């Protein structure tokens, strides 16, 4: 039975639909909708249900659904107003999961939809300080299956990949989802969801007062429109109510979210209605239509992988599902996303970093940025990823004193199966750009400069063949009375792939300024901005579980950190769609610091059929 998100079901059809989705697959990255349920190719449930013990299932209000398995039960619901505590992002996400009979704090599709989030866990969690909601939940009834001895159908088990095959794993998830529906709650809900943004200074008590005020305002009872709550549970169609308000020909059971901001955008309200017939009328008018047009307001799930105990390949599917739920790439790009979810490592590896100086200072070129300032020595050794795609870069201050500048590359531990990289011997770096504007002093114009010319592939293969950075090194050249720092890159090619999309890191205006003017403008803009001492820094949510997620710590804090930005520049799985590679880079000077920016690209592998 097909179901469109904006189709209004009558009471009997809604009950039949609630029964029919029990045991179907579900993609937890989706909002709770009937349309997101998944069947087997022949339209069957994913789990085995005994067809020999069927009976008529009676619902509240006298609705009867025929030929329902005895393992499927129905319980009467209740009418409840719930106002949550003021919770953090992870606490609220965990609460939503618990309401769906799930554990953990990974945001679900329903959670993201209710609070109008972007599906990027770290960014969403970093953008808000607290979350809360206040609303009416009209549960007419709930339908559940007995979970004892719940078993997947053999045809579903046979499709579980026995190895890490990204295409097969992505196909399984797209076909069957990530979970199995074991419970459905039908009725309606009218809820205000509140997001306190990170920049807000309101205390939790103030947020609670605002929430109560907005809730009382939205859910107030108009004595003229007030109806008996008993009509909500009667389950009998009362068409006179719909006709009286002109709701019969129009209206939907699922309305779009209404998003409202406070004046300074510190607080956001997301108002959502599900079930009933919603034409933007008052809460009281909407309330009396819920029994005539109920919709799904909640579901309970069990993970598909929990029903695969002992089956070969369960671990691979479980890992793929966890990655999909954590980072939520578009389902149509899940194949490419999974291919790139290999361990990432830095070259050189942490254990290879020198504890002392590898070479004498005389053999390392140096840069001087002021008359009395320290020298910055430059490690000009070539860093090679071994024909493996580079996904990030960083500067690192090596040596016992932390005064040797080196470049490091983050790369995949292996090359994805769909890529076939080979080094391009025809590529030759551009020696020196003609435009003088690319040579930028770090402090004063009479001392060392940095070449900020973008380094990209310009080899003999000028077609759409994909070029990926696999090597990098630094070089120092004398130009007149000054020394200039250059970035050099080496590239590998894949003739079977093309570049689909490319973009650079955000470049600040300071990176285009030079010398004294950069320092002056930076100080002026700093004076006009809020005092850093009184401004609370925005905390970044890091879901990276690596031993050194922010890079190895030097033995001592180098003095030259005031001249070098050692921040890691990379795009990981949390950056949609999660399989970016580095295809270019450039040096920058920002606020008196040498930094590096990367150019990222998405690749598309061309099938052999399309090449014929």
Swiss-Prot record:
Entry's Gene Ontology cellular component terms: nucleus
Deletion phenotype: Constitutively activated HR-like cell death phenotype with endogenous accumulation of high levels of salicylic acid (SA) and constitutively activated defense phenotype. Dwarf plant with spotted necrotic lesions on its rosette and cauline leaves. Accumulation of high levels of callose and autofluorescent phenolic compounds localized to the necrotic lesions.
Protein origin, superkingdom: Eukaryota
The keyword Endoplasmic reticulum belongs to this UniProt entry's keyword annotation: no
Stretches assigned to the MACPF domain: 5-338
GO biological process: defense response by callose deposition; immune response; plant-type hypersensitive response; regulation of salicylic acid mediated signaling pathway; regulation of salicylic acid metabolic process; response to salt stress
Keywords: Hypersensitive response, Immunity, Innate immunity, Plant defense
Keyword DNA damage: no
Entry similarity comment: Belongs to the complement C6/C7/C8/C9 (TC 1.C.39) family.
Task performed by this protein: Negatively controls the salicylic acid (SA)-mediated pathway of programmed cell death in plant immunity.
Protein name: MACPF domain-containing protein NSL1
């Amino acid at each position: 039975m097909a179901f469109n998100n904006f189709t209004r079901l009558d009471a009997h059809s809604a009950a039949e639909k609630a029964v029919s989705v029990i045991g179907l697959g579900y993609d937890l990255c989706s909002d709770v909708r009937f349309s997101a349920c998944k069947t087997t190719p022949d339209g069957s449930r994913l789990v085995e249900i005994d067809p020999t013990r069927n009976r008529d299932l009676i619902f509240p209000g006298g609705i009867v659904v025929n030929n329902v398995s005895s393992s499927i039960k129905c319980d009467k619901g209740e009418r409840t107003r719930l106002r949550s505590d003021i919770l953090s992002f992870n606490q609220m996400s965990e609460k939503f999961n618990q309401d769906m009979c799930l554990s953990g704090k990974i945001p679900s599709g329903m959670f993201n939809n209710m609070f109008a989030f972007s599906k990027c866990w770290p960014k969403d969690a970093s953008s808000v300080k607290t979350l809360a909601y206040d609303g009416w939940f009209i549960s007419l009834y709930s339908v559940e299956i007995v979970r004892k001895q719940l078993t997947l159908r053999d045809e579903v088990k046979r499709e579980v990949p026995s190895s890490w095959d990204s295409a097969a794993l992505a196909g399984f998830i797209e076909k069957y989802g990530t979970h199995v529906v074991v419970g459905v709650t039908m009725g309606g809900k009218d809820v205000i969801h509140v997001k306190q943004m990170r920049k807000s200074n309101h205390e939790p008590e103030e947020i609670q007062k605002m929430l109560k005020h907005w809730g009382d305002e939205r859910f107030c009872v108009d004595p003229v429109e007030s109806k008996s709550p008993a009509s909500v549970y009667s389950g009998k169609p009362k068409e006179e109510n719909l006709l009286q308000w002109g709701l019969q020909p129009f209206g939907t059971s699922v309305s779009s979210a209404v998003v409202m901001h406070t004046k300074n955008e510190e607080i956001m309200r997301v108002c959502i209605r599900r079930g009933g017939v919603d034409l933007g009328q008052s809460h009281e008018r909407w309330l009396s239509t819920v029994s005539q047009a109920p919709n799904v307001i909640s579901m309970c799930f069990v993970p598909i992988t929990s029903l695969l105990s002992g089956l070969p390949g369960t671990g691979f599917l479980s890992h793929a599902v966890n990655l999909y739920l954590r980072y939520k790439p578009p389902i149509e790009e899940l194949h490419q996303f999974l291919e790139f979810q290999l361990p990432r490592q830095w070259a050189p590896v942490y254990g290879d970093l020198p504890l002392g100086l590898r070479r004498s200072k005389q053999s390392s070129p140096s840069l001087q940025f002021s008359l009395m300032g320290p020298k910055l020595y430059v490690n000009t050794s070539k860093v090679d990823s071994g024909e493996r795609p580079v996904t990030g870069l960083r500067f690192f201050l090596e040596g016992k004193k932390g005064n040797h500048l080196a470049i490091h590359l983050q790369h995949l531990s292996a090359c994805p199966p769909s890529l076939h990289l080979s080094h391009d011997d025809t590529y030759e770096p551009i020696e020196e750009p003609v435009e003088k504007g690319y040579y930028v002093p770090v402090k004063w114009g009479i001392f060392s400069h940095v070449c900020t010319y973008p380094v990209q592939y310009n080899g003999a293969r000028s077609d759409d063949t994909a070029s990926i950075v696999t090597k990098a090194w630094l070089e120092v050249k004398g130009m007149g009375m000054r020394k200039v720092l250059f970035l050099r890159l080496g590239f590998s090619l894949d003739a079977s792939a093309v570049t689909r999309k490319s973009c650079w890191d955000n470049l600040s205006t300071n990176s285009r300024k030079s010398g004294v003017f950069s320092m002056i403008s930076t100080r002026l803009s700093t004076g006009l901005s809020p005092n850093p001492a009184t401004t609370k820094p925005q905390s970044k949510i890091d879901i990276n579980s690596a031993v050194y997620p922010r890079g190895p710590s030097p033995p001592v804090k180098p003095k030259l950190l005031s001249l070098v930005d050692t921040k890691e520049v990379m795009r990981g799985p949390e950056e949609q769609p999660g399989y970016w590679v580095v295809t270019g880079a450039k040096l920058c000077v920002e606020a008196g610091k040498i930094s590096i920016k990367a150019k990222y690209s998405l690749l598309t592998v061309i099938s052999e059929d399309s090449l014929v």
